[in-house]
């Protein structure tokens, strides 16, 4: 038994094997023919030899491993029919590609081969094994192949011949023509076959060959034009898709920026709201309105008086000039030990409020303290003085020390 495979089928399988990242498998399509060789020697002795030749014309690759059998090596006929379809009768074998393995059939492959032989009904089913071997430094790559015909006892190796790859002698070429499966080619031959072939299939005229050639070229050019148009359409569609993708990405970026800006504004507003005081600013410790009513009752007894630096004479002058003395606020003058703790009035106004208008600390004083405080208060403030003289006197006279530094000038509540 001998076997041969067409050049383009062998090159296609080798190309697929070299460029694949994993193992793959498929089916071999072709036919099996018988050759009879009759030889006569010089001694008038004739010898007849019959040779069975397996011709592989095409192949049908599978999409992945385990496509027509399961992990238990059981062949599924439905999957097999779905892969082969109408080519089931042309199957003469199957092939498999493995990397860096020995060129021997595995037990799984032997089990699958027996099932395929029974299901397909081909007794001479063959198995073609491809293996790709490379050296350690990847300097040499070798693609090895071997054809098996499994028997009951052992796996018989069959020599595989590839036409047009050896010597260019006539013996290396195939005797029978390879069937062409192209529909366009069959259509052209059907139209122009009667012009240069007789009924017996003998060529009539060589001129008809050129006509067929021109017709084929026209078909090819038409197909090329259609392919070019379709490629242009695909390019334009791809450009539109890329443009839409860029627009979508840009809109997403804009929305993300807006969201970040809103978050930044919210984060800025939250600290500002947290820093705002929860209560209104307090008024000055003591003072009088334009009508002369005291606001001592409105202040809390525990609030300390503001520093004297806030009521510096220069500051008072600027305040009086701008506000036209509509709202004048003065702090009590520093007083000696034992003096009254009543606040002095500005603009010639005297304190005429009742005891309810005093601070709780001031109203807690005894009767004797009140009498001495009234005398001291009259000595310090002269009713005959005009508001302007008092203002000038307060401007020229300046306390030497801060009330916080001199314990003699501090205000004490009488208990």
Swiss-Prot record:
It comes from the Eukaryota. Induction: Up-regulated in heart in response to ischemia and reperfusion (at protein level). Residues 220-241 are annotated as: Important for interaction with BBRC36 and other subunits of the BRISC complex. Residues 368-379 have a biased composition (Acidic residues). Keywords: Cell cycle, Cell division, Coiled coil, Cytoplasm, Cytoskeleton, Microtubule, Mitosis, Nucleus, Phosphoprotein, Ubl conjugation pathway. Signal peptide: none annotated. Its main location: cytoplasm. The modification Phosphoserine is found at residues 274, 280, 368, 372, 375. Residues 249-323, 336-415 are annotated as: Disordered. Residues 215-222 are annotated as: Important for interaction with SHMT2. Residues 312-322, 337-347 have a biased composition (Polar residues). Residues 3-149 form the MPN domain. GO terms for molecular function: microtubule binding; polyubiquitin modification-dependent protein binding. Pfam families: MPN_2A_DUB_like. Disruption phenotype: Mice are viable and fertile, and are protected against toxic shock caused by bacterial lipopolysaccharide (LPS). IFNAR1 'Lys-63'-linked ubiquitination and IFNAR1 internalization are increased. Belongs to the FAM175 family. Abro1 subfamily. Component of the BRISC complex, a multiprotein complex that specifically cleaves 'Lys-63'-linked polyubiquitin, leaving the last ubiquitin chain attached to its substrates. May act as a central scaffold protein that assembles the various components of the BRISC complex and retains them in the cytoplasm. Plays a role in regulating the onset of apoptosis via its role in modulating 'Lys-63'-linked ubiquitination of target proteins. Required for normal mitotic spindle assembly and microtubule attachment to kinetochores via its role in deubiquitinating NUMA1. Interaction with THAP5 has been shown in human, but rodents lack a THAP5 homolog. This is BRISC complex subunit Abraxas 2. It comes from Mus musculus.
């Amino acid at each position: 038994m001998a076997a041969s495979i067409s050049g383009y089928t062998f090159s296609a399988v080798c190309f697929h094997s070299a460029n694949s990242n994993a193992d793959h498998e498929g089916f071999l399509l072709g036919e099996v023919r018988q050759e009879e060789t009759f030889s006569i020697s010089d001694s008038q002795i004739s010898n007849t030899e019959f040779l069975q030749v397996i011709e592989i014309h095409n192949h049908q690759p599978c999409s992945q491993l385990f496509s027509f059998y399961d992990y238990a090596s059981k062949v599924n006929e439905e999957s097999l029919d779905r892969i082969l379809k109408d080519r089931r009768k042309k199957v003469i074998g199957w092939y498999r590609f493995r990397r860096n393995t020995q060129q021997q059939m595995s037990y799984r492959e032997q089990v699958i081969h027996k099932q395929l032989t029974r299901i397909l009904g081909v007794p001479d089913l063959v198995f073609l094994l491809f293996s790709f071997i490379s050296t350690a430094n990847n300097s040499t790559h070798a693609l090895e192949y071997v054809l098996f015909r499994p028997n009951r006892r052992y796996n018989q190796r069959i020599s595989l011949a590839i036409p047009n790859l050896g010597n260019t002698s006539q013996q290396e070429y195939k005797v029978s023509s390879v069937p062409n499966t192209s529909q366009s080619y069959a259509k052209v031959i059907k139209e122009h076959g009667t012009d240069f072939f007789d009924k017996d299939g003998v060529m009539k005229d060589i001129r008809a060959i050129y006509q067929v050639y021109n017709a084929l070229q026209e078909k090819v050019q038409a197909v090329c034009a259609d392919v070019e148009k379709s490629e242009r359409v695909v390019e334009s569609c791809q450009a539109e898709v890329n443009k839409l993708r860029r627009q979508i990405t840009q809109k997403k970026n804009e929305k993300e920026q807006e969201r970040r800006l809103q978050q930044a504004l919210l984060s800025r507003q939250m600290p500002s709201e947290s820093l705002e005081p929860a209560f209104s600013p307090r008024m000055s410790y003591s003072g009088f309105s334009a009508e002369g009513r005291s606001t001592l009752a409105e202040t809390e007894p525990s609030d300390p008086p503001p520093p004297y630096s806030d009521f510096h004479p220069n500051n008072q002058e600027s305040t009086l000039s701008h506000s036209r003395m509509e709202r004048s606020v003065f702090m009590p003058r520093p007083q000696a030990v034992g003096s009254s703790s009543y606040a002095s009035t500005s603009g010639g106004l005297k304190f005429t409020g009742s005891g309810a208008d005093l601070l709780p600390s001031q109203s807690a004083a005894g009767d004797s303290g009140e009498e001495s405080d009234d005398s001291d208060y009259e000595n310090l403030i002269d009713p005959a003085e005009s508001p302007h003289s008092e203002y000038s006197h307060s401007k020229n006279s300046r306390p030497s020390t801060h009330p916080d530094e001199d314990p003699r000038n501090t205000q004490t509540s009488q208990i």
